[in-house]
From Swiss-Prot:
<dbReference type="InterPro" id="IPR002912">
    <property type="entry name" value="ACT_dom"/>
</dbReference>
<dbReference type="GO" id="GO:0005737">
    <property type="term" value="C:cytoplasm"/>
</dbReference>
<comment type="subunit">
    <text>Homodimer.</text>
</comment>
<dbReference type="InterPro" id="IPR045865">
    <property type="entry name" value="ACT-like_dom_sf"/>
</dbReference>
<feature type="site" description="Essential for activity">
    <location>
        <position position="182"/>
    </location>
</feature>
<dbReference type="InterPro" id="IPR018528">
    <property type="entry name" value="Preph_deHydtase_CS"/>
</dbReference>
<keyword id="KW-0584">Phenylalanine biosynthesis</keyword>
<keyword id="KW-0057">Aromatic amino acid biosynthesis</keyword>
<dbReference type="Pfam" id="PF01842">
    <property type="entry name" value="ACT"/>
</dbReference>
<feature type="domain" description="ACT">
    <location>
        <begin position="203"/>
        <end position="280"/>
    </location>
</feature>
<dbReference type="GO" id="GO:0009094">
    <property type="term" value="P:L-phenylalanine biosynthetic process"/>
</dbReference>
<feature type="domain" description="Prephenate dehydratase">
    <location>
        <begin position="3"/>
        <end position="189"/>
    </location>
</feature>
<dbReference type="InterPro" id="IPR001086">
    <property type="entry name" value="Preph_deHydtase"/>
</dbReference>
<dbReference type="InterPro" id="IPR008242">
    <property type="entry name" value="Chor_mutase/pphenate_deHydtase"/>
</dbReference>
<keyword id="KW-0456">Lyase</keyword>
<dbReference type="GO" id="GO:0004664">
    <property type="term" value="F:prephenate dehydratase activity"/>
</dbReference>
<protein>
    <recommendedName>
        <fullName>Prephenate dehydratase</fullName>
        <ecNumber>4.2.1.51</ecNumber>
    </recommendedName>
</protein>
Length: 315
């Protein structure tokens, strides 16, 4: 079974995502659904476990529909030895407010919450526990552990963690936005990407010269080839004030001619291109990359020594 590091302890949404990815047979070399979860204390620690060989893969959150992308994940992917994305899954996220058995809402003075979770239930807490004192937790499951061990009165946590620690629920299905979702990635050391499925995503990190028009020129490599971008985001390079790297996700696979040509052009144009992978999403996008054009087919036939196979465009 594949050792997969994740933000622990047992009972986090990340563990649920890990189990879903494994059950779907999306772990390279382990399509039997088997996985050995390896809980760690943070998302960067999960990725470092892959880099050091302590785990074969890591399952980490990358973005949620409430607060957007998660900076610790982005930074850990861009800095350090290269890693690659092999699969993803998206979970509907709703929280439970839990206490020890016999504790009522009127008894709650302190509440533990993972900061990402606290941001997604802020309105509920204001309405139902306006005077509660918030205590930080390093994960949703850690918040539940703090309640079970008597460190706080209540926690914002996952149903999985609540069941694991045998806690009592004050409220279930708590979330300020009813369509809250979080996307998770399966990440390993670089290797051959999963085969093209037609519903794929490709991601890169671009470092470009700090000159006028440089970003526009880089993005034009996608636009001129009809490639749809699904995300573009900047993060500091940490090498100097005002210097940034750019995370770009696009529809398509490195096996698509248009995507491959864009990546080659970016490699020539940018100071650095870090390829984060091409992987199946299971989602159909309207802007699929265009198929190989007639000129590309003609060139491939020349390489194969078959110039007569293509009649060329009509005169």
């Amino acid at each position: 079974m594949a050792r997969i590091a994740y933000l622990g302890p047992e009972g986090t949404f990340t563990q649920a995502a890990l189990l879903e990815i494994a059950a779907a047979g999306l772990v390279p070399g382990h399509d039997d659904g088997g996985a050995q979860p390896l809980p760690v204390e943070s998302t960067p620690a999960a990725l470092d476990a892959v880099r050091t060989g302590a785990a074969e893969f890591a399952c980490v959150p990358i973005e949620n529909s409430i607060d957007g992308s998660l900076a610790p994940t982005l930074d850990s992917l861009a800095i350090g030895s290269p890693l690659q994305v092999f699969a993803e899954t998206t979970l509907d996220v709703a929280f439970s407010i839990v206490v020890r058995p016999g504790v009522g809402a009127a008894d709650v003075r302190t509440l533990a919450a993972f900061p990402v979770a606290a941001a997604q239930v802020r309105q509920w807490l204001t309405a139902h526990l306006p005077s509660v004192e918030l205590h930080p937790a390093y994960s949703n499951a850690d918040a539940a552990r703090q309640v079970a061990e008597g460190q706080v009165d209540a926690a914002v946590t996952s149903p999985l963690a609540a069941a694991h620690w045998a806690l009592q629920s004050l409220a279930d299905g708590v979330v300020d936005e009813s369509n809250a979702r979080t996307r998770f990635l399966l990440i390993g050391v670089p290797g051959p990407p999963p085969p093209r499925t037609g519903t794929d995503r490709t991601s890169v990190v671009l470092r470009i010269a700090n000159v006028p028009g440089a970003l526009l020129d880089a993005l034009t490599e996608f636009g001129m080839r009809g490639i749809d971008l699904t995300r573009i985001e900047s993060r500091p390079t940490r090498t100097g004030l005002g210097t940034y790297m750019f995370f770009v996700d696009c529809v398509g696979h490195i096996a698509d001619d248009a995507v491959a040509e864009a990546l080659k052009a970016l490699h020539r144009r940018c100071a650095d291109v870090r390829y984060l992978g091409s992987w199946p999403t299971g989602q159909t996008y309207a802007g699929q990359p265009p198929p190989a054009d007639e000129a590309a087919i003609w060139l491939q036939q020349l390489r194969e020594g078959k110039p007569e196979a293509s009649p060329g465009p009509p005169l």
